[in-house]
UniProtKB/Swiss-Prot annotation:
The gene is anmK. This is Anhydro-N-acetylmuramic acid kinase. It comes from Microcystis aeruginosa (strain NIES-843 / IAM M-2473). Catalyzes the specific phosphorylation of 1,6-anhydro-N-acetylmuramic acid (anhMurNAc) with the simultaneous cleavage of the 1,6-anhydro ring, generating MurNAc-6-P. Is required for the utilization of anhMurNAc either imported from the medium or derived from its own cell wall murein, and thus plays a role in cell wall recycling. The keyword ATP-binding applies. InterPro entries: Anhydro_N_Ac-Mur_kinase, ATPase_NBD. GO terms for biological process: 1,6-anhydro-N-acetyl-beta-muramic acid catabolic process; amino sugar metabolic process; peptidoglycan turnover. It is an enzyme of class 2 (transferase). It catalyses: 1,6-anhydro-N-acetyl-beta-muramate + ATP + H2O = N-acetyl-D-muramate 6-phosphate + ADP + H(+).
Length: 378
């Protein structure tokens, strides 16, 4: 079955689009990437999305218009990826997250992904599955992360313990015990580790007065020295101490949050590069701390994906904090494209929904039950 996966994450870089061929059975899928492309948002739309993610208020009418505009660009991405390929039979669209509230006490969580599937299906004339997180949240789960089940099927190893570490705007991990271990699927864990690129990107935009949107390959940060005392202070953030299941987003790690980190740094007389190096170290240490604090064992291998996988300085700092016994790779090195891994994941989640196969792992999200994820629009 030919399926398109569409994904735009918390970095709001653009629409990651993957055309994949899925064969085999739902419980033993074979996935081949036929084409992958990231289509940038139009500048005005990206700016509006970032403003909304930052807490800017919209009228209901403006929100509806934003939803339609995002859906139109997602639909165009799906049409573009097929121009030199066979027509897809199904689309799985994550949409654009603009708000995420984890569950608390007796209150269900809440999440908003814009770019409605009904509009994508109408424009493309291809059945579209979207709103993947809602069913898990209705079962008292976080609705995130949803990728661990895909990681289990595509990236687990017979004898090695692995972690898959996505470093997008937010970092999230999947812990994969060896497949030969008894009841290994019940022992899979996953959660959001904290900031991935989000604070680094916001800082680069601030320091460059909007001329740069990210630290290319970590070159700016690599010119500085992280301030250990300052990073230790930042690590007192309660989220880092919270036990899984847990999820987070730009609602916490926001421009206002970065402004506080900037204020904290004033007492240390840091250069711009030192501050960026410290923010990069915060991401690296928060990931390593998550592993060392919450995992039953350290992995033999960590497989990186997402934009942060291309940041050489971040990789260097992460390896330093994880320790020499951990091998750091990208998912490319084990056969899964790291740039389009999330888009591939939502193609497979759509395929599972189409075939009535549950897509969540309750022990990961905190949901009461495994459920079908996504709503089908024809």
């Amino acid at each position: 079955m030919l399926v398109i996966g569409l994904m735009s994450g918390t970095s709001v870089d653009g629409i990651d689009t993957a055309l994949v061929e899925i064969s085999g059975t739902v419980e033993s899928p074979q996935v081949q990437l036929l084409a992958g492309e990231t289509y940038p948002y139009s500048p005005r739309l990206r700016e509006t999305i970032l403003q909304v993610c930052g807490g800017e208020k919209l009228s209901i009418e403006a929100l509806a218009s934003l939803d339609d505009n995002i859906a139109a660009e997602f639909a165009q991405a799906a049409l573009n990826i097929q121009k030199e390929a066979p027509k897809a039979q199904l689309i799985g669209s994550h949409g654009q997250t603009v708000f995420h509230r984890p569950p608390a006490n007796d209150r269900l969580g809440y999440t908003v992904q814009l770019g409605r599937g009904a509009a994508i299906a109408k424009i493309t004339r291809i059945p579209t599955i979207s709103n993947f997180r809602a069913a898990d949240i209705a079962q008292a789960g976080h609705g995130a992360p949803l990728v661990p089940k895909i990681d289990a099927y595509l990236l687990s190893h017979p004898t090695k313990t692995r972690c898959v570490q996505n470093i997008g705007g937010i970092g999230n991990l999947t812990y994969l015990p060896p497949r030969q271990r008894e009841n290994w699927q019940q022992k899979i864990f996953g959660w959001d580790t904290g900031p991935g690129n989000v604070l680094i990107d916001l800082a680069v935009q601030f320091l460059s007065q909007g001329q740069q949107t990210y630290d290319h390959n970590g070159q700016w940060s690599a010119q500085g020295q992280p301030c250990s005392e300052l990073v230790h202070k930042w690590l007192q953030e309660p989220y880092f101490q919270q036990y899984p299941p847990k999820s987070t987003g730009r609602e916490l790690f926001s421009p206002a949050y970065l402004a506080q980190l900037r204020e904290d740094a004033q007492a240390y007389c840091l250069s711009d590069a030192d501050w960026l190096a410290s923010l990069t170290d915060l991401t690296a240490i928060s990931i390593a701390h998550s592993y060392q604090t919450f995992l039953p064992e350290m992995p033999a291998e960590v497989l990186l994906c997402g934009g942060g996988a291309r940041n050489a300085y971040l990789r260097q700092r992460l390896l330093a904090h994880l320790g020499s016994n951990v091998k750091l790779l990208t998912t490319d090195e084990v056969g899964l494209n790291s740039d389009f891994k999330e888009a591939i994941a939502f193609a497979l989640l759509a395929y599972w929904r189409w075939h009535n196969f549950p897509g969540n792992l309750p022990q990961v999200t905190g949901a009461k039950a495994a459920v079908l994820l996504g709503e089908i629009y024809r």
